[in-house]
Each structure stands twice: as structure tokens, then as C-alpha cells.
């Protein structure tokens, strides 16, 4: 009593305190960062290593395996995967959430250093690492185009100057430059000319390497001066290499341009990048794990004027893709939804109270509670994201509930003729315990979420804390500011025998009378209501089992990512044509705004594309509908497939797959994996629950096996090293020397001129100089035959791995897809030597599925414990929790009606319903118990009177919560995929709960009361007189 009086009778102090915490909230709002979702990035580090010309199997055994053994000893590694392709190895390390990325990076560098002695000596550089996840879509893509600069020159400028500058921006994890390679002097050898001159390829290599030397020469000095010695020991351009003498024949000099073409070109000619229909260099920028995407993009944009100033006029720099506009638009939509929710909730209060003054009180309580929450969010290190703003939107209905309960009870006393300050004090005193019970039991729902581990726990933590803080502040406001305003703003009124005869008042009276009549009938037919109650429990179980489930709603971020997979024996020239064909098909779609793509490098038969769609308001179709439409056209391209997927704000795992979900096959036997992977992939491709099936297991690449006749080689004076060196010099794009320039270092690349290596006959022109100086053709000591070979070798841990990626057809849920895969694996009878498991998002979905029921039961148990403590009873909490089955049925039926799968967002809705719908029962039970204690009423009379007396606040609080969530259901535009499941669940649950709990709660109350009396009689003992 004294606590409430302290604030009621000191209005100035109360107002100033409320104003102070509101100002703190406004300041917190201005300081809060903006993000699409809470930070849930796993710390990921990518290690790269290269050995030009090495086969995938060589890279896997000699480079990947030593690095994996060393990196696998690092503490906190959650998963390690590797992919080795032609001349390149990439290892992805995914760490636990609690691992600091910078500390992990130091351990990675130490592990690389430890493995260095085990790596091949011919590697041109040490392995490097980047603190970025290569499977994440770039947060921004910049393109460079020019009509006068070559692709190599553009690439050099981009990698030497732009990429270096961008990489230094806070939040940037990696800048991947694609579309070409660094400039180089390329030497294209003529095998026939070399044979005629008697010059071996190794002799050419050694001559070039010896002619381009960068060594210190020292200095000369006397008593007065000092002279630095400088020589012309370096060759920097093709023109300087052309007259280089590499051999003498019969006293005549054989120069390099006599036996080769020497050109200024690029290190790897098998690279191509495009933006729309124009050749381009791409700068793909990825953020560091656990950094804010909006802040990073803003920092890059702030740097763009400086970058533009660095760029020559002949180069055009454009932003081809930016993830931030759709994120900002989505957050703006949520903010508008929040504003609409506040307005609707206040409108509900006004319609019930029909008083401007009375409505002003909750109209003040709502913004004070919500705005003050921003201060707590800032102190907790949260961000303004879709989930935290959705929490505030839902909180609108909660925070007004407490104020409504207090206000309605005070209004009831005022209508009875009590003085305002007395009514405020007594009304607050009467419902204070009720309000505290409702708020604490609602906050208790979120305790299991706060204790939940893994990615789902981290994802939902901000939502739970934000909502809990808003409810806590609302509780304080409703017991301090609300009664104070009631006491000083509202006036006493004479008792009304027929109150509210107009509009909503008449409707409410009619509803209350109808409810009273129907409640009497229900209380006389309790068995029928009991059957209905038990039926809702059974229906909950059936609906939960039957409803399709997924991990997270499929988002439309306005960005698509595509992976090209062509025939494994395709040439680079043909692959570049496929890229152009696919880009044209996509560019012609009316919903597409921009297309960029690249191909080449170590994976000749693959490519990547990034597609920016028009803003949501300028297109009718969703991203998934656009993918479905394009899929039909893309399948008509012969010899290649383009797999499209919508970029999501949550991307789990480090695998760079061509679809949204992955299923990984592991085996310690590579032969077993190669035998079973095609069978499993074929069986999965026949499933209607899966689409876009593809695999990173590629072992049908064209290979030419050379079989050396070692006896003949020994007789001819040739060793294996010389033969292998010949092949590397001829066909490996071998980097034989380095050109040092002020801004960068460039390579001299040697190979047989492509004009002489267009078919297998090129091998017949190869020869080796033996120990006697004679030219021995390769065909003298080697035979060759075509065969199949892997284009890539993949590991997970230290096991051979193959990942099958898949998308979901429209109308199919992730649960249906995973069930179909598990069923197929069982039917195939896959041996124990081949193990299958879901990866990435599908793996987290499986883990979440296993814990969902446990989480719901934990929330119910927590609420029961809190209510049991508050009521000092084992029975009354059960009465209150009896409202939950009807809410669950309503939520699940609403999801089915809207064809929405049960996702993590829907789970949040169910958890919220556990907290919301019990409020009705709390108000009924509180007043019934008080009526029994102080009024001497029977349980039947007490619960009947409580139901009628609390009918108006029950309707007000339920409608307020319902209208607070309704904008989420009706919202469209960016980000609506996230908001709608939450709104659907809450509104559906509230509608069904309101229809049933007004009748089932009194019946359950009487059932437990009779049960209590029955047990008390059994336990009572007769008194014996002595």
C-alpha cells in the first residue's frame, strides 16, 4: 500500500522519473546499431594454398592433408572441411560460438607455420588465411569496366590499390577479386622450333630464370662519396624478354623469340568476369564474422569518394550489388508495423473506455515502456533488427495489458462513486498481485530461451531479453505512473444502473449478458466441456506431428546467388560461353535489375553469378517465384546447369554449395564413397520433395594418363624428374620467374603455345634432352591413354567427403525433405562404411527439431513453478495453464490455413501464447479466490462472478494483444516473410483461446476444487476424546 501511495501522491516525482527513463531510451535508440538479425555468425577462417599445375589428388594428399592434421589440433574447432582442385586447396575452419576470432586466427597461423616443413617445396607462396566465410554472399560487389584498359590492367589496379584500401575498412573480412588475374609475361613455346634447335623446355626455363635476377650488388665508396651499384639485371616486359639468348647452335645464338611467342598478358588466361553483358573485374566484399553488415556497408560507401578519386578517368566503378537497401527497407517496414500496432492498441482501449482522458493513460504507458526498452537494449549490446523490433511490436499488446487491468479496476471504483485518489490507491492495491503474477509468469516463459544453447539460442536471445525488459518496465509503469495519472486525471461518476448504452458499450453489455447465460449452461454440463478440453489436447499432438516444419522462414532479400555446374570435361572457352548464355537468360527477366558473374580459375567447369532483383514494390513475384520461372528457361541450356537460390540473412556452415541445404556423405574409403555417391544422388534426384540436386563430387573429368617405361628411360639416360618437369613446363602454366615492380610483383609464365596444344597430339611433339644431350621424344618412353579423374577432392575432418546440395520445391517444407532423404537412405541399404548426415542449415534444423518439445515443456514447467510460488498452491497453476491447449490448436490451425510451415519464428509465437493466454485465467482465478475468501461464496458462485466481473478487462487485453499482432499478419513488403508467421501464430492462438477458455477455465477451476475437497476428506482423521 505504501509503495503505491508513494507514487500516487507525488505526481511530479513520478512524471520526472518516467521522463528520465524515456529520455534514456531515446538516447539508446539513436546509438543502437542496425542489422537484419542478431549476430549469430560462427567464427569462420578460410585457409588457402596453391601449387600451380598440381592435380586435385596431389593437392589433397600433399597440401590439404598436412595442413588438416596441423589445423585439426586447434581448440574450439567445430567443423573442418577442405576442397582441393587443380592447383588450389581451400580449408574452412568453423569455430564454436565462444571462440574469439582473433585468437583463433593466431592459432591458425601457428598451425600453418608448424605444417610448413611438410608442404611441397615448389609452392610459390606460403598458405594464407582470411577471417571470412566463403559461403556467405558478399555484402557488396563493385565492378570495374573500361573501353581502353585490358582485363589484366583492370585486375592489377583493383587488387593492388582498391582491394588493399577496402580491406582496411573496419568490418571487412575479405575482398575477393575475380574476372581475370594479375599481369604477367607469357611465354608460348613452339615445340617444333625447340626440337629443330635442340633446346629443351627446361633449358628455356633456366635461361629465363637466370636472366631475370634481383640481387643486392653493394656499394663503392671513397673518402668523399659513396656509390650504390645498380645493374640492368631485371627484365620487366615482353619486349625485353624477346631477344634473350637461350642457347647457341653451331656458334649461332638462339633467341627466345626464335622458339616462342612472348606477350604481355596475365598469369591465368582461364578467367572471365562480366557485369550484365560487359567484361568486368569484380570486387566481392565479405564482412568479418560477428560484425554489423549495415555499419560495414556504410563505412565502404563513405570510402567510395576516396576510391573514385584514385581511379583513372578511363575506368568506370559501379556498385553492382548492395545488401543494405533491402535490410533497411525491412526494418522500416517493421517500424511502421510497430507504429500501427501502437495505434490499434490505443484505439481498442478507447473503444472500450469511450473516454479521452482514460485512453490517454495507457497511451502514455505504452510509449514510455517501449521507448525505455531501447536503453536496456543498448546496455546489453543489442541492435535494431527484425527480431528485436518484432519483440517490441508484440510487446505493444503486453505492455498495455497491465495498464488496462489497473485502469479498468480503478475506473470501476470511480463509477461506484469513490474519490479519484482513493480509487487509484485501492484499485491498484486490489489488482497489484494480479498484474505482478501476469508479468512474472510471462517473463518466466522466456527463461528456457535464455538458457538455450547453439545458434537458435543466440538468435532468440535478443528477442526474449527485449520482450522481457519491455514487460518489466511495463509492470513498473502500470503500478506507478498509471495509478498516479488515474488519481489526478480521472473524475468520480455516479453509479450507472445501465452503463454504456451506445455503440461499443451496448455491444459489450449484450456480449456480457450472452456470456453469462451461456456460462450458466456450461457449468451445468461440465462433462461435455471436459471432453472438448481433452479433445484440444489430442488435437494439439496430432497437428504438431502433421504440420510441415522448417528452420527459418524463406526470405526475399532481393538478391539471388547462382552456381554454374557444367560437363566435367568442358573447356574454358566453352564454359565462358555458358556463362554468357545464362547471364542473357537472367538479364532478360523483367524482375532482374543487375547480373554479375565469373568463371575460371582452379574449377574450370564451374562459375558463380550474383543477381540483384528490382525492389519489392516494383515486382509482383517473390524471389522464389522468380527462381521457379527462371528454372524452366535455364534447363534448356545443353551441357550445363545453373542452380539459383535466394540469399538469406542466415547462412550456416562454410560449404560453398550450389543450393540452400546440404547432405554430406563421409567415408574413410574413397572407393566406397565413389561407388555410393552416384547411387544416392540418383535416388535423391527422383524425390519430388527435393529440387536442384547437385553434388561437389566430380570424378568424371577428362584425364590423360602417361605410363612411363622406366627400363627404356634408364637405357636412354632420362629420369622421371626430367619427364615430369617437361610436362609441367609445357602444360602447367608454370611460373618460372618474378618481376618486381614498385606496387606489386608479377610472374613470368611459361607453357606450350595454345596453338600447339589444342589436342592430344601435342604430347607427340614433346621431347626431353637426355644426359648425352640428345633430344628424345616423349613417345619413345611413355604411352598415354584417356581416363576419368576427379576435378576436386573434398574432406571433412580427415575423412573423404561428398556434399549433395538441394533446394526445396515450392510448397515443400524442410521437414518433408529431410524425412524423404532419411527414408531413401534406409531403403538403399547404404553400408556402414558410408555415413550420411545433414550439414549447415539442415543440420541445425535437425538439432532444433529435437529440442522444440523440450523447450515448450520447459517453458510450461517454468511458468508452473512461478505461479505455484506466487499462489502457494499446486492446483491453481494447473487451472491457469489449462488455457494453453486451445491456444496451441488455434496457432497450428492458423499456420495450416495460411500454408505456413512451423518454423523458429512460429515457435516464438507458441512461447508467447503460453504467456499471453494464461492472463485470462489469472484474472478469473484471482477474483474467484478473493470472492471465496472475503465474500463467503461457493466455488461455483465465485468463479461465475469472477468471469462476469473480469469479462471486460479480459476482452480488452485479448483484443489489445490481437490487434497488436494483427499488423504482422497483414504486413507486406520487405521482410514480411519473417513477420507473418509470428503474427499468424499469435492471432490464431488468441482467437481460439478466447472462444474456449472463457468456458474451459471455470470448468477446470471447479474440477480441481472438487478434487481438492475429495482429497482433503480422505486425509482428514476423526477427533478422539481422551
Curated annotation (Swiss-Prot):
Keywords tagged on the record: Cell inner membrane, Cell membrane, Membrane, Transmembrane, Transmembrane helix, Transport
Superkingdom assignment: Bacteria
Gene Ontology molecular function, alphabetical: xenobiotic transmembrane transporter activity
Gene3D superfamilies reported for this sequence: Multidrug efflux transporter AcrB pore domain (3.30.70.1440), Multidrug efflux transporter AcrB pore domain like (3.30.70.1320), Multidrug efflux transporter AcrB TolC docking domain, DN and DC subdomains (3.30.2090.10), Multidrug efflux transporter AcrB transmembrane domain (1.20.1640.10)
Localization of this protein: Cell inner membrane
InterPro entries, per the entry: AcrB_DN_DC_subdom, Acrflvin-R, Multidrug-R_MdtC
Its membrane topology: Multi-pass membrane protein
Residue ranges of the TM segments: 15-35, 333-353, 360-380, 387-407, 431-451, 463-483, 528-548, 853-873, 897-917, 953-973, 984-1004
Cellular component GO terms held in the UniProt record: plasma membrane
Subunit relationships: Part of a tripartite efflux system composed of MdtA, MdtB and MdtC. MdtC forms a heteromultimer with MdtB.
HAMAP family the UniProt entry points to: MdtC
Family: Belongs to the resistance-nodulation-cell division (RND) (TC 2.A.6) family. MdtC subfamily.
PANTHER family to which the protein is assigned, alphabetical: MULTIDRUG RESISTANCE PROTEIN MDTC, PTHR32063
NCBIfam families: PRK10614.1 (NF007905), RND_permease_2 (NF033617)
Listed name of the protein: Multidrug resistance protein MdtC
Organism from which the protein derives: Salmonella arizonae (strain ATCC BAA-731 / CDC346-86 / RSK2980)
The encoding gene: mdtC
Amino acid at each position: 500500500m505504501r509503495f503505491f501511495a508513494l507514487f500516487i501522491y507525488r505526481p511530479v516525482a513520478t512524471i520526472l522519473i518516467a521522463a528520465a527513463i524515456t529520455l534514456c531510451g531515446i538516447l539508446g535508440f539513436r546509438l543502437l546499431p542496425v542489422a537484419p538479425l542478431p549476430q549469430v555468425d560462427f567464427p569462420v577462417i578460410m585457409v588457402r594454398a596453391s601449387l600451380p599445375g598440381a592435380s586435385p589428388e596431389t593437392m589433397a594428399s600433399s597440401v590439404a592433408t598436412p595442413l588438416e592434421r596441423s589445423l585439426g589440433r586447434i581448440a574450439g574447432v567445430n567443423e573442418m572441411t577442405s576442397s582441393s582442385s587443380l592447383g588450389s586447396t581451400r580449408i574452412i575452419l568453423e569455430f564454436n560460438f565462444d571462440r574469439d576470432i582473433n585468437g583463433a586466427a593466431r592459432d591458425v597461423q601457428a598451425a600453418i607455420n608448424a605444417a610448413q616443413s611438410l608442404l611441397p617445396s615448389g609452392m610459390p607462396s606460403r598458405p594464407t588465411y582470411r577471417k571470412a566465410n566463403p559461403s556467405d554472399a558478399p555484402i557488396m560487389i563493385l565492378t570495374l569496366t573500361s573501353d581502353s584498359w585490358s582485363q589484366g590492367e583492370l585486375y592489377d589496379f583493383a587488387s593492388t590499390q582498391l582491394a588493399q584500401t577496402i580491406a582496411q575498412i573496419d568490418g571487412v573480412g575479405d575482398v575477393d577479386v575475380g574476372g581475370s588475374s594479375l599481369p604477367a609475361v607469357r611465354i608460348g613455346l613452339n615445340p617444333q622450333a625447340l626440337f629443330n634447335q635442340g633446346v629443351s623446355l627446361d633449358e628455356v626455363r633456366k635461361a629465363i630464370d637466370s636472366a631475370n635476377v634481383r640481387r643486392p650488388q653493394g656499394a663503392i665508396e671513397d673518402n668523399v662519396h659513396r656509390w650504390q651499384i645498380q645493374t640492368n639485371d631485371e627484365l620487366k616486359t615482353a619486349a625485353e624478354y624477346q631477344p634473350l639468348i637461350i642457347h647457341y647452335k653451331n656458334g649461332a645464338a638462339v633467341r627466345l623469340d626464335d622458339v616462342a611467342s612472348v606477350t604481355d598478358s596475365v598469369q591465368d588466361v582461364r578467367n572471365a568476369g562480366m557485369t550484365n553483358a560487359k567484361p568486368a573485374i569484380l570486387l566481392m566484399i565479405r564482412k568479418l564474422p560477428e560484425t554489423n553488415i549495415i555499419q560495414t556497408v556504410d563505412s565502404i560507401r563513405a570510402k567510395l569518394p576516396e576510391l573514385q578519386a584514385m581511379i583513372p578517368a578511363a575506368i568506370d566503378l559501379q556498385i553492382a550489388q548492395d545488401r543494405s537497401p533491402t535490410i533497411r527497407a525491412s526494418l522500416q517496414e517493421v517500424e511502421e508495423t510497430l507504429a500501427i500496432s501502437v495505434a490499434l492498441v490505443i484505439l481498442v482501449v478507447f473503444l472500450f473506455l469511450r473516454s479521452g482522458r482514460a485512453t490517454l493513460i495507457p497511451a502514455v504507458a505504452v510509449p514510455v515502456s517501449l521507448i525505455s526498452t531501447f536503453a536496456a537494449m543498448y546496455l546489453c549490446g543489442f541492435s535494431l533488427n527484425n527480431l528485436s523490433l518484432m519483440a517490441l511490436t508484440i510487446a505493444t499488446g503486453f505492455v498495455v495489458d497491465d495498464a488496462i487491468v489497473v485502469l479498468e479496476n480503478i475506473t470501476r471504483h470511480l463509477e461506484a462513486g469513490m474519490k479519484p485518489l482513493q480509487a487509484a490507491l485501492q484499485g491498484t492495491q486490489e489488482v497489484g498481485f494480479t498484474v505482478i503474477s501476469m508479468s512474472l509468469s510471462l517473463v518466466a516463459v522466456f527463461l528456457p530461451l535464455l538458457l538455450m544453447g547453439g545458434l537458435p539460442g543466440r538468435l532468440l536471445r535478443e528477442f526474449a531479453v527485449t520482450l522481457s525488459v519491455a514487460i518489466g518496465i511495463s509492470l513498473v509503469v502500470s503500478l506507478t505512473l498509471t495509478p498516479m495519472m488515474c488519481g489526478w486525471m480521472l473524475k468520480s461518476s455516479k453509479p450507472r444502473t445501465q452503463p454504456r448504452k451506445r455503440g461499443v458499450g451496448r455491444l459489450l453489455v449484450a456480449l456480457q449478458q450472452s456470456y453469462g447465460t451461456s456460462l450458466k449452461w456450461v457449468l451445468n454440463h461440465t462433462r461435455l466441456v471436459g471432453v472438448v478440453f481433452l479433445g484440444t489436447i489430442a488435437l494439439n499432438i496430432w497437428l504438431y506431428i502433421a504440420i510441415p516444419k522448417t528452420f527459418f522462414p524463406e526470405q526475399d532479400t532481393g538478391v539471388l546467388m547462382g552456381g554454374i555446374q557444367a560437363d566435367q570435361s568442358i573447356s574454358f572457352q566453352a564454359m565462358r560461353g555458358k556463362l554468357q548464355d545464362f547471364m542473357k537468360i537472367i538479364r532478360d527477366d523483367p524482375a532482374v535489375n543487375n547480373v554479375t558473374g565469373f568463371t575460371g580459375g582452379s574449377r574450370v567447369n564451374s562459375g558463380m553469378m550474383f543477381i540483384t532483383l528490382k525492389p519489392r514494390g516494383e515486382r509482383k513475384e517473390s524471389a522464389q517465384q522468380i527462381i521457379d520461372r527462371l528454372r524452366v528457361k535455364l534447363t534448356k541450356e545443353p551441357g550445363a546447369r545453373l542452380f539459383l537460390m535466394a540469399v538469406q540473412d542466415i547462412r550456416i556452415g562454410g560449404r560453398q554449395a550450389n543450393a540452400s541445404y546440404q547432405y554430406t556423405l563421409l567415408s574413410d574409403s574413397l572407393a566406397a564413397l565413389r561407388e555410393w555417391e552416384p547411387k544416392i544422388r540418383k535416388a535423391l534426384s527422383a524425390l519430388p520433395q527435393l529440387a536442384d540436386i547437385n553434388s561437389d563430387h566430380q570424378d568424371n573429368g577428362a584425364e590423360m594418363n602417361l605410363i612411363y617405361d622406366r627400363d627404356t628411360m634408364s637405357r636412354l639416360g632420362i629420369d622421371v624428374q626430367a619427364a615430369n618437369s617437361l610436362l609441367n613446363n609445357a602444360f602447367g602454366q608454370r611460373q618460372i620467374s618474378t618481376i618486381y615492380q614498385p606496387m606489386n610483383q608479377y610472374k613470368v609464365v611459361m607453357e606450350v603455345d595454345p596453338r600447339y596444344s589444342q589436342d592430344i597430339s601435342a604430347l607427340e611433339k614433346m621431347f626431353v634432352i637426355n644426359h648425352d644431350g640428345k633430344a628424345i621424344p616423349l613417345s619413345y618412353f611413355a604411352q598415354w591413354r584417356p581416363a576419368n579423374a576427379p576435378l576436386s577432392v573434398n574432406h571433412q575432418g580427415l575423412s573423404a567427403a561428398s556434399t549433395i546440395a538441394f533446394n526445396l520445391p515450392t510448397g515443400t517444407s524442410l521437414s518433408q525433405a529431410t524425412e524423404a532423404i532419411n527414408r531413401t537412405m534406409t531403403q538403399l541399404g547404404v553400408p556402414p562404411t558410408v555415413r550420411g548426415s545433414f550439414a549447415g542449415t539442415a543440420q541445425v534444423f535437425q538439432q532444433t527439431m529435437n529440442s522444440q518439445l523440450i523447450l515448450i515443456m520447459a517453458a510450461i514447467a517454468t511458468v508452473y513453478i512461478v505461479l505455484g510460488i506466487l499462489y502457494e498452491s499446486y492446483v491453481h497453476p494447473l487451472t491457469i495453464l489449462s488455457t494453453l491447449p486451445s491456444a496451441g490448436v488455434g496457432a497450428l490451425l492458423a499456420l495450416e490455413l495460411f500454408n505456413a510451415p512451423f518454423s523458429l519464428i512460429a515457435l516464438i509465437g507458441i512461447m508467447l501464447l503460453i504467456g499471453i493466454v494464461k492472463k485470462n485465467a489469472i484474472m478469473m482465478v484471482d477474483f474467484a479466490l478473493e470472492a471465496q475468501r472475503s465474500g463467503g461464496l461457493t466455488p461455483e458462485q465465485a468463479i461465475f462472478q469472477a468471469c462476469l466481473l473480469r469479462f471486460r478487462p479480459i476482452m480488452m487485453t485479448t483484443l489489445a494483444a490481437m490487434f497488436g499482432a494483427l499488423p504482422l499478419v497483414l504486413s507486406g513488403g520487405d521482410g514480411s516473410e519473417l513477420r507473418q508467421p509470428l503474427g499468424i501464430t499469435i492471432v490464431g492462438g488468441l482467437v481460439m483461446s478466447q472462444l474456449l477458455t472463457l468456458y474451459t477455465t471455470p470448468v477446470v477451476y471447479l474440477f480441481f476444487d472438487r478434487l481438492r475437497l475429495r482429497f482433503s476428506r480422505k486425509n482428514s482423521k476423526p477427533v478422539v476424546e481422551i
